[in-house]
Amino acid sequence: MKLLYTDMSQDLTEILTEQASSYAQKGKRVFYIAPSALSFEKERKVLEYLPQSASFDITVTRFTQMARYFILNTSNPKTQLDDTGLAMIFYKVLLHMGDDELKVYGRLRKDSNFINQLVDLYKELQQANMTVLDLQHLNQVEKQEDLVRIFSAAQDLLLAGDFDNQSKLSAFFKEITSGHLDEALSNTVLVIDGFTRFSAEEEALVALLNDKCHQIVVGTYTSQKAYKANFVYGNVYQASVDFLRTLAQTYKVIPDYVTTDKEGNRSFARISRLLESRHDFSTVDETVTEQDKHALKVWEVVNQKEEVAQVAKSIRQLLADGKRYKDILVLLGDEESYKLHVGQIFRKFDIPYYFGKEESMSSHPLVEFVDSLERIKRYNYRAEDLLNLVKSGLYGGFAQEDLDLFEYYVNFADIKGRHKFLSDFTANSRDKYNLDQINALRSQLIEPLDKFLNSRKQKGSSLLKKLVVFLEAVQLPSQMFELSTKASEAEKEQNEQVWKAFTHILEQVETIFGDESLSVDDFLSILRSGMLACDYRTVPATVDVVNVKKYDLIQPHSAPYVFALGMTQSHFPKVGQNKSLLSDEERSRINEATDEHRRLDIVTQINSKRGHFVAMSLFNAASEQLVLSQPQIINESQDDMSVYLKELLDLGIPLVEKGRNRFEAKGDQIGNYRDLLSTVIALNSSHLDLDLDKETQTFWSVAVRYLRKRLDKDQVLIPKVIDDVTTTKVDDQVMQLVFPEEEPLKLSATALTTFYNNQYLYFLRYVLELEELESIHPDARHHGTYLHRVFERVMGDSSSESFDDKLEKAIAQTNQDQPFEILYTEDQESRFSRQILEDIARSTASVLRDNAAVKVEREEVKFDLLLANSIKITGIIDRVDRLTDGALGVVDYKTGKNVFDIQKFYNGLSPQLVTYLEALRQTYKVDADQLFGAMYLHMQVPQLNLAQIGLEKLAAQAHKELTYKGLFVSSETEHLTGGNYDLQKTVTYDKEDLETLLDYNIKLFRSAAEVIRSGNFAINPYTEDGKSVQGDQIKSITHFEADRHMGQARKLLRLPKKGKKEAYLELMAKTEEENQMQVSENTISFPVIDHAVRVDKKDQEDNHVD
């Protein structure tokens, strides 16, 4: 064995390539061994350094692949299993074990994560040259017994099924030991590069090959100073020094320090020496130079998006300077959080890149198909799982319109569970749904699915056949073909890989579970676990791309230009964590009890020295320039600076703040056309003249003209970011169809409230007639109708029975009404809602029972009022009461808390009670002095705070809560005193005030009708304070944003509380000429006010449909 080491300023791969080439010239077969994750990059570099750029005698590979070259022709009839196959073996083993057989892991028998941990431990034991019997000294004896039982059963199953149960290196090891390869190995030379440690399996193999091979050359990076030091703990080269010293001691070899004639980058060499001296507590007579500051830069950026954008701009500048994409390497501290940003921004900058990370197949439609299939069975036909299956694009050739109809109905009827999906759908809403069509669709969707999922427990081979029949019935193969015909080349390749993985899993299921009795649940669970564990294999489309990968795989001299992103404390250095079934303490005790070349890795013990070596490799990764960048905000949280970056700053490397001046007009900051375009769009053009000098203004003016020409040439339309949300006039033909001119405009109190809430909300509901998603479950509307019906029956019962008996009879009769019986017996939740409603009816009824001074005149009174032959006001009054003096009043039942607020009324948001009084006045042909008021009766159980109310006052306070609240005529209050009426001064009005309210209410209707007839509906939700919006913004449709569009909101007129009623009445009483409401496109002005107003909530207080 020959051991070589060199400084990181030297290129070790070049040195080892010369060694390999010299042995090849002597007729030796050379294997150049690199770590698995680096074999591709090593092969490329070795080929570059070979004098002839290629050699048949030198093979760049990894340990496991090298073994195949020697044992490829060796007969091995055993079936090979990959990780998915091993997982199936463990699944089968655990399937035959009961919970009581495994004392620690009994509850995890079918947990896919636990099975994956078993697979990882199985492979780790192979790499450690151990068996499960070596797992002694665990924290729990029961844990050891469980693992021995599981692994022993798995080993028996592998042997019984004639599966290959050893790794490639183990098979190679056996062939070497047998002596069959002595002749071939005697002419073989191994050159090992890129390692700072061997696994136990690799270590044993190297020891064996050292006696058989012609030569083994091992090279690594360290300094002479570090290797010769007596104390290396904490040294930046501790990992490689320990590695070298162990090999030197084992094989009695003195390592040689080697160099080349080529001098590396002096700046990186100097920085490496300075860092080394900081960690070995020595001093060097060197300082950082200006050249060093140019070669190594430390950036600080606000966030990840800006960080990637700055790197992209620098890459575009390097290209402008004549560099190639392949000369640039981008390293990531956290791959997952940067993947999306890198993809989006590099595409914007037209930078081709290769992300060297396997991508999960989990988002592919076929994987979603299998996942949904398993979840449907596991959760007994949960609606969301079944809808995901049929909407995967691979389930039958159904039209999208049919699938949308099916989904809409399932959500409406709340279909859950196998029984409901197999039964005919019967629920309907005003005959809105074509049940024959929907049930025919249900049969086509559910029948083939249920036929497969309802299969009894049987052999795996039989279930596979039934699965194939099911897949053909739902046309999965043809749908996959159809999916590929519309796909891009990259997507076609992905589809091919997914299909290959799917069929491979089915083959392994046939092999392992063919004769095993399986339930459909277990069968689908196996398929799902296998598919979710699959990854896409990615290969760069061309060599000339920017390589992107995680930084901890970096090697010195990887590329001329290197950008390392996300170098924060959390990710640089990376701290390895133990996530296996064995703790660090257990691993340590096992290692102490085993002999040489048998060892479990303890990741946490090597974190420090591994972190130092990776950092030094990163600092020497570039041959020209290295940029280390850290964002202040990463993964939406603030992170501190890495200790390694702090060390660089202490050495004198300056911290460069990037992205502070995003719109600086420098040629080397533009990058490319798309970036310039996005920058111009982002600029606020109204501030250009204020913020930029004349020269910069000229630059941007020219740039904008250039961009406009490019946009026109390429026919590119840029979505505008608008600061207002405007609407266009509704077509006259549409208005004539919805609101014919020859007919009066129909309005109700609810429609009027909607209009003054937000004009556009009225347009959606009453012009387009859009509806919210319905549900078969009762809601506030149904609850209100139920209580209406109860009280209607109670008040209409003229029998001699007691009031309480009448009430109970009314509740029983209402419960038996077919609509309510269906609604309130659907499930436990519905029955509970009915129970609450019955309690509310009994609580509220006490108000009706004690109201002797009032006689119920009529109930459910429909009215149509005609205003000037142009407006028809419609509605239903819940109850009309008559006092003993003949005065009439209105009662409206409410399930929520409502009061008459004159401020809301003035602003058009509470016209209901006044509208009902107008209906009484015109229907009964009475004057205002013959009305006693309009009020709400809140149908609810009083809720009292027992901490604030004593028991002696509890009954009185509860009774007080059950009162009529609204507006009352002051002259009639003497007849109401002592009853359940809230007669505060602020809600009592004399005859003249009531006339004012009635007249102003008509003005509200007329003003609204004028706007509606015009066809101009503004997006103007109301605001009470001008700072926040209370009206319905309908954001998903209008894109209204309070912070940007507050100017279009309708601001309500708010007056001080003192004298509020009188002030509003005075405003209403002004002559119509002085107080005419002017309704424009964006504002609705009210008397003596000219503000904009807005709305955000649909007023659903009216519990019946007008």
Curated annotation (Swiss-Prot):
InterPro entries: ADDB_N, DNA_helicase_suRexB, P-loop_NTPase, PDDEXK-like_dom_sf, PDDEXK_AddAB-type, Restrct_endonuc-II-like
Keyword DNA-binding belongs to the record: yes
Entry keyword annotation includes DNA-binding: yes
Example of a GO MF term: helicase activity
Cofactor(s) needed by this chain: Mg(2+)
GO biological process: double-strand break repair via homologous recombination
Subunit structure: Heterodimer of AddA and RexB.
Misc note: Despite having helicase-like domains, this subunit does not have helicase activity.
Free-text function comment from the UniProt entry: The heterodimer acts as both an ATP-dependent DNA helicase and an ATP-dependent, dual-direction single-stranded exonuclease. Recognizes the chi site generating a DNA molecule suitable for the initiation of homologous recombination. This subunit has 5' -> 3' nuclease activity but not helicase activity.
Full protein name: ATP-dependent helicase/deoxyribonuclease subunit B
Organism: Streptococcus thermophilus (strain ATCC BAA-491 / LMD-9)
Gene of this entry: rexB
